[in-house]
């Protein structure tokens, strides 16, 4: 068979152009018996690692080859060309070429290249030039110039596109080649691995050009021929140019480069004179251990762990990596930035002693092999969380320390998800925005299995309409396709030498940031080490809470400012609060599922919080571990574990692993320990099991470990049924298994945030509000919860408020929470600073403020809308009237005093007072909360007439009782572990109610569940023994119209039409719910 190499294959990393994944191209090329394939995406190397990973398995079986290249597209008229580096040095030059082009482009994601960029590098590449589709007068001269720049390395690409004049076109291209003295090379210029992807490629093309498939015309391919073809088909197509087929082998002959050749070198860290990196790390670790435990009382267990870890770190030469993370953490702490490590790094006593993590090895059993293992040859990965508002300072420190040539953020591939796929496909197929939106709104969360016909019908669409059917089919295929590259949340790659000779680097959308083209899985594949500089809102909240306590209660805690390490531990009052499920705003345990679990688990000590964090996860739930654990914890079920045969090990070997979790494996480390102890896996095999647990839903790889583990346990005397059950529990972890060390890191913050809520609720509420946006709860729910805990909350006021929410002393010596200007939607921090700067004397009137301040009328209107003039003894309506009398912003300075004087002469108009309901509505419109009431109380009379109860009545209702309730939807959740069950949290003037919606009810009332803001529910009370109350829904109604009607009616009376049009919240009564899929 004639060898044929396809050297111009574009994957879907030629964004919105290629219609196949890199893996699909490699797999298909091998299946078609091609000799090899070259992946050449347009101005990027973003997809090559995925192709390489797929090829690694294939090459073990055959001589099939993969080539790493790029299709260069120029902005100066130079024709497109695919280039392949011959060796490692040439690959580095290709990376630098793309990096230069990316930084030259003004628009993120583009790459502006000119022929001069390639000219001095051309001799290092194999180059195939693509002729223009139509005659260009200067093409022959340009081709000759390219050929002279890289003699013997340039080919002219020849395709047979089946467009009616292939023969004539081929003759023209052959003449160009002859004139320039370059050979022809055959290619199919591939855009997809299989012809059935052509319709999707049309959609991608239409999307790229912001048009529809029907209007795209010549922008689309004329047929479905640009797919991978087998060698015999290519030989037939090029029968008049057999030399072009043979040239593919000549083209690849000098190419030796593979990604395997990338040898990563971590940067050396500065160390004290006369010391090695190993000695410096050794000193820092033992100094840290002495600080934690006392120099003479370091526990023997800890000493042994330190020696073990330091020996392995030295063996693998990872000392510089640990020193880097130590340096970053130290810098953050010197700047007063809270930080804490988490993830598998919390398995390391070295990380604990260095102050990187907060998990004390005397509290939790650490499994260092989960973090670093000599056998698996993977670099360590340390995740450190920093305050989200100050994380950028740390990131810029990293850039400054290592330079932008040697440091960059890892990429994140932004891929199509269900809704975005439907939207883009719908637009491309010419569906109206209304139809596309309706179709997209039928989808909740990720989905690759299509859209239920009934859901399409409920959206008011015809599921039998062929365009609708086509849109759904194409969208399903598009899910998972890369849309564009973005920056990772904080993963840095650092290099000893130029990083841009290993991977291209481009500018990020954020100023002063740059990121590489590979994501975290790609860098794992090629062995690059990553330092994660992550952000965590709760750390910001905790730091602000510590500051407020130190500012307002300096007499407490010995006058010292609290730290993560110094806060009082094991406080009974904190655990009592959590046992009640009173955890709104508390880190990691504020979700509905966690609030319901807390009264059942009843945490009494720190390790209970570790379990609490981990147990409400899809892994333990799907592995059927939750109920057995709770039954054993409450004494309803004995905890008995089998033993191996006497000759194979101690009788309590499983008890040592599972004792703390009542015989139930809840953590990844436990799964690995069971495999190593009960089935005698090596550490490498145990890590393979962990990896299989993490990927089996995508790859199905965990089954390859099943026989080995079960047989290993049976051979050591365990019952086969027990071994199978044990393995099935582990398999249930899926990709959701939680490392114990990670849970322990998060449990630390659970306790600290719960302690703040328990002992300083006003401080905690202020810190939460000042750290928004956070995750679960909106400001209205945070304020409601604070008031339920006895906190006095005061409104925004021009004479008392700051930008942040602050604490004020009250006559009864309690601290009240004063809302800040940040709560007013649309009011800027700059205007706040101007207002406060001129507040040495209190503001007396709005006219007084206007004379003293250079705020525009819009700012005054926002203040009036928010009822922020309370201390001036003027209500919202009068304030709005007064603001309308202020001079226009365009008034010239010369006339400003005259205008103000004229304004002052007009007597104040007596306006009718606003109704309480009007005030509440306006509050929600401007500050997203109200201290005066809740919109539902003004609908209560009508609701009561319908027999609708309050949320408080639901909480007090008897088990099994049928009730009706209505409330504003604040949270929607459909956890992946809940098997289609949807949970709603609704709110009225009396509190909240928790709603459970079973899948069969969800199917009937899907639209109401997904879109209602005010919802009416009929159902039956379900009350657990621990007092957790749900209303199990049987029927739902969308009553949002009542809110909208109230909003429109009251807003018309409150705000002039011209103001309504520019209102920052578009006159919404309630903020949107927070939805979690």
From Swiss-Prot:
Pfam families: DNA_pol3_alpha, DNA_pol3_finger, HHH_6, PHP, tRNA_anti-codon. GO terms for molecular function: 3'-5' exonuclease activity; DNA-directed DNA polymerase activity; nucleic acid binding. One of its GO terms (biological process) is DNA repair. CDD domains: DnaE_OBF, PHP_PolIIIA_DnaE2. InterPro entries: DNA_pol3_alpha_NTPase_dom, DNA_pol3_finger, DnaE2, DnaE2/DnaE/PolC, DNAPol_HHH, NA-bd_OB-fold, NA-bd_OB_tRNA, PHP_dom. SMART domains: POLIIIAc (SM00481). GO terms for cellular component: cytoplasm. It is found in: Cytoplasm. DNA polymerase involved in damage-induced mutagenesis and translesion synthesis (TLS). It is not the major replicative DNA polymerase. Keywords: Cytoplasm, DNA damage, DNA repair, DNA replication, DNA-directed DNA polymerase, Nucleotidyltransferase, Transferase. It comes from the Bacteria. The keyword Transit peptide does not apply. Gene3D superfamilies: 1.10.150.870, Metal-dependent hydrolases (3.20.20.140), Nucleic acid-binding proteins (2.40.50.140). Belongs to the DNA polymerase type-C family. DnaE2 subfamily. This is Error-prone DNA polymerase. Its main location: cytoplasm. Its EC number is 2.7.7.7. The keyword Nucleotidyltransferase applies. It catalyses: DNA(n) + a 2'-deoxyribonucleoside 5'-triphosphate = DNA(n+1) + diphosphate.
């Amino acid at each position: 068979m004639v060898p044929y190499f396809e050297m111009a294959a574009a994957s879907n990393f030629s964004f919105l152009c290629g219609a196949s994944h890199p893996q699909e191209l490699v797999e298909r090329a091998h299946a078609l018996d091609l000799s090899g394939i070259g992946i050449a995406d347009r101005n990027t190397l973003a997809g090559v690692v995925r192709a390489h990973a797929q090829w690694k398995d294939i090459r073990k079986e055959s001589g099939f080859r993969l080539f790493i290249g790029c299709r260069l597209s120029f902005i100066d008229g130079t024709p497109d060309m695919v280039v392949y580096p011959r060796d490692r040095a040439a690959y580095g030059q290709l990376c630098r070429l793309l990096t230069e082009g990316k930084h030259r482009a003004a628009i993120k994601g583009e790459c502006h290249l000119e022929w001069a960029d390639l000219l001095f590098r051309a001799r290092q590449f194999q180059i195939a030039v693509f002729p223009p589709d139509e005659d260009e007068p200067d093409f022959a001269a340009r081709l000759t110039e390219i050929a002279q720049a890289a003699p013997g390395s340039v080919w002219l690409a020849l395709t047979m596109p089946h467009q009616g004049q292939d023969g004539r076109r081929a003759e023209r291209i052959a003449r160009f080649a002859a004139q320039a003295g370059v050979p022809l090379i055959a290619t199919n210029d591939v855009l997809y691995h299989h012809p059935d992807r052509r319709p999707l490629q049309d959609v991608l093309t239409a999307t790229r050009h912001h048009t529809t498939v029907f209007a795209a015309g010549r922008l689309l391919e004329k047929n479905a021929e640009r797919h991978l073809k087998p060698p015999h088909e290519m030989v037939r197509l090029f029968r008049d140019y057999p030399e072009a087929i043979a040239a593919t082998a000549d083209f690849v002959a000098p190419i030796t480069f593979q990604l395997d050749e990338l040898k990563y070198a971590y940067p050396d860290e500065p160390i004290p004179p006369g010391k090695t990196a190993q000695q410096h790390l050794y000193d820092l670790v033992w100094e840290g251990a002495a600080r934690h435990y006392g120099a003479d009382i370091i526990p023997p267990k800890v000493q042994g762990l330190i020696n073990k870890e330091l020996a392995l770190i030295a063996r693998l030469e990872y000392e510089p990596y640990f020193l880097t993370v130590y340096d970053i953490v130290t810098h953050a702490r010197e700047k007063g930035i809270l930080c804490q490590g988490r993830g598998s790094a919390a398995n390391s006593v070295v990380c604990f002693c260095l102050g990187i993590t907060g998990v004390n090895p005397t509290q939790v059993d650490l499994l260092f092999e989960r973090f670093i293992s000599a056998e698996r040859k993977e670099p360590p990965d340390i995740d450190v969380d920093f305050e989200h508002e100050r994380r950028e300072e740390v990131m810029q420190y990293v850039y400054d320390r290592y330079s932008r040539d040697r440091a960059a953020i890892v990429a994140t591939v932004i891929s199509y998800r269900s809704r975005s796929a439907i939207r883009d496909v719908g637009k491309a197929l010419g569906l109206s925005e209304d139809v596309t939106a309706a179709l997209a709104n039928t989808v909740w969360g990720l989905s690759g299995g299509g859209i239920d016909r009934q859901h399409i019908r409920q959206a008011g669409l015809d599921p039998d309409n062929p365009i609708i059917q086509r849109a759904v089919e194409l969208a399903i295929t598009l899910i998972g396709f890369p849309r564009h590259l973005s920056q990772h949340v904080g993963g840095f790659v650092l290099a000893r030498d130029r990083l841009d000779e290993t991977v291209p680097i481009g500018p990020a959308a954020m100023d002063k940031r740059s990121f590489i083209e590979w994501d975290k899985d790609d860098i794992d594949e090629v062995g690059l080490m990553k330092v994660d500089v992550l952000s965590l809102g709760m750390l910001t909240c905790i730091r602000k809470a510590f500051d407020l306590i130190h500012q307002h209660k300096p007499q407490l805690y010995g006058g010292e400012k609290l730290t993560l390490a110094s806060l009082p531990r094991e406080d009974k009052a904190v655990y009592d609060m959590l046992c009640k499920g009173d955890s709104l705003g508390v880190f990691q345990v504020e979700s509905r599922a966690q609030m319901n679990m807390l009264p059942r688990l009843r945490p009494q000590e720190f390790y209970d919080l570790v379990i609490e964090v981990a147990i409400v996860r899809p892994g333990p739930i799907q592995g059927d571990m939750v109920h057995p654990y709770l039954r054993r914890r409450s004494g309803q079920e004995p905890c008995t574990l089998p033993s191996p045969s006497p000759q194979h090990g101690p009788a309590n070997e499983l008890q040592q692993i599972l004792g703390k979790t009542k015989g139930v494996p809840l953590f990844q480390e436990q799964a690995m320990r069971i495999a190593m102890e009960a089935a005698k896996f090596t550490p490498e095999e145990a890590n393979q099991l962990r990896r299989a647990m993490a990927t089996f839903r995508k790859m199905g790889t965990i089954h390859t470990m099943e026989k080995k583990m079960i047989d290993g346990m049976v051979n050591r005397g365990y019952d086969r049924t027990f071994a199978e059950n044990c393995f099935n529990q582990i398999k249930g972890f899926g990709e959701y298994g939680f490392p114990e060390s990670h849970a322990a890191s998060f449990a630390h913050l659970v306790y600290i945030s719960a302690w703040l809520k328990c002992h300083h609720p006003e401080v905690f509420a202020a810190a939460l509000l000042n750290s928004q946006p956070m995750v679960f709860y909106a400001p209205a729910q945070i304020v409601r919860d604070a008031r339920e805990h006895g906190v006095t909350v005061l409104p925004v006021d021009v004479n008392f408020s700051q930008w942040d929410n602050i604490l004020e002393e009250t006559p009864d010596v309690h601290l009240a929470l004063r809302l800040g200007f940040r709560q007013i939607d649309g009011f800027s921090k700059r205007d706040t600073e101007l207002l406060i700067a001129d507040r040495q004397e209190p503001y007396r009137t709005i006219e007084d403020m206007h004379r003293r301040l250079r705020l525009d009328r819009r700012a005054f209107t926002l203040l009036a809308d928010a009822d922020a003039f309370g201390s001036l003894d003027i209500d919202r309506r009068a304030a709005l009237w007064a603001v309308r009398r202020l001079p226009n912003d365009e008034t010239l300075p010369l006339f400003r005093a005259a205008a103000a004087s004229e304004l002052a002469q007009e007597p104040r108009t007596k306006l009718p007072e606003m109704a309480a309901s009007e005030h509440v509505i306006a509050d929600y419109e401007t500050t997203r909360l109200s201290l005066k009431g809740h919109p539902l109380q003004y609908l209560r009379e009508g609701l009561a007439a319908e027999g609708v109860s309050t949320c408080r009545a639901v909480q007090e209702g008897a088990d099994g009782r049928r009730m009706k309730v209505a409330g504003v939807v604040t949270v929607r959740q459909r956890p992946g572990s809940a098997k289609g069950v949807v949970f709603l949290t609704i709110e009225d003037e009396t509190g909240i109610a928790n709603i459970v919606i079973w899948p069969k009810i969800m199917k009937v009332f899907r639209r109401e569940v997904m879109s209602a803001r005010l919802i009416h529910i009929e159902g039956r009370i379900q009350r657990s023994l621990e007092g957790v109350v749900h209303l199990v829904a049987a029927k739902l109604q969308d009553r949002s119209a009542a809110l909208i009607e109230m909003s429109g009616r009251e807003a018309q009376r409150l705000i002039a039409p011209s103001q309504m049009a520019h209102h920052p919240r578009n006159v919404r009564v309630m903020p949107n719910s927070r939805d979690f899929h």
